[in-house]
Amino acid sequence: MEKLIVGTLLLTVLSGGISQSDMDGKAFIFPQESSTAYVSLIPRVKKSLQNFTLCLKAFTDLTRPYSIFSYNTKTQDNEILLFVQNSGEYMFYVGNSAAIFKAPTSLYDPVHICVNWESASGIAEFWLNGKPLGRKGLKKGYTVGGEAKIIIGQEQDSFGGNFDAKQSFVGEIWDVSLWDHVIPLEEAHDSCDGGNLINFRALTYEENGYVVTKPKLWT
């Protein structure tokens, strides 16, 4: 009985295949190139954003372009998009406008990405593996829509769909957090815990296609 209660607390399956789970210590694995494998992340609250902070960890050995995090609304593609165009070249979109951050990377190392953006100044700040890659400006005064589809594993070319296998993510993603405010990234890079919109320790999500959940290999 005790084990059953604990299991119920850790994983609750909701209608339509949606799950709630403490994903601490686990990773989503996207084992192969696909246009059908992805995970929908469901925020605790749907709200418009004038500031946000996004942190996540990932591993891949892809050398082609791929999407890591895709946030679309019905009226705007690439409201928030984290996309790798080339090795070490990170394209960060807000409101379908991009800033590019470049860093030397080892092809076979996991990455810890933290980025924030504030509407008032338009400044986006990007950190990779605990080191700042600088600050750039985009979409000053913009408001990110709140009625969104949030997807990891694919890049949305329409609201919740129109995926291209050649932009799909192959590898592992874990410790995803999203906040509705700016967090100093020199603090956030130590941990990806506690997002008030998306929190990996209390995650609501839906797996689609060939996605596997396993204990994470890296911290």
UniProtKB/Swiss-Prot annotation:
Q: Which cysteines are joined by disulfide bonds?
A: C55-C114
Report domain Pentraxin (PTX) positions: 24-219
| Pfam families the record matches | Pentaxin
- State the gene name recorded for this protein: Mptx1
Amino-acid positions noted as binding Ca(2+) 1 in the UniProt annotation, renumbered to this chain: D77, N78, E155, Q156, D157
**Gene Ontology biological-process entries:** innate immune response
Q: Can you supply one Gene Ontology CC term for this chain's record?
A: extracellular space
Q: Which residues form the signal peptide?
A: 1-19
User: Chief localization class?
Assistant: secreted
Does the keyword Nucleotide-binding feature in the UniProt annotation?
no
Q: What induces it?
A: Strongly down-regulated in colon by dietary heme, or by dietary depletion of vitamin E. Up-regulated by calcium.
Subunit description:
Homopentamer. Pentraxin (or pentaxin) have a discoid arrangement of 5 non-covalently bound subunits.
> MF terms per GO, please?
complement component C1q complex binding; metal ion binding
Q: Which UniProt keywords apply?
A: Calcium, Disulfide bond, Metal-binding, Secreted, Signal
Disulfide bond listed as a keyword: yes
Cofactors that this protein relies on: Ca(2+)
Note accompanying the cofactor annotation: Binds 2 calcium ions per subunit.
Q: Where in the cell is it found?
A: Secreted
Entry binding sites for Ca(2+) 2: E155, D157, Q167
* Protein name according to UniProt: Mucosal pentraxin
Q: Which family does it belong to?
A: Belongs to the pentraxin family.
Tissue-level expression reads: Expression is restricted to small intestine, stomach and colon. Within colon, expressed in epithelial cells located within the lower to mid region of transverse and distal crypts, but not in proximal colon.
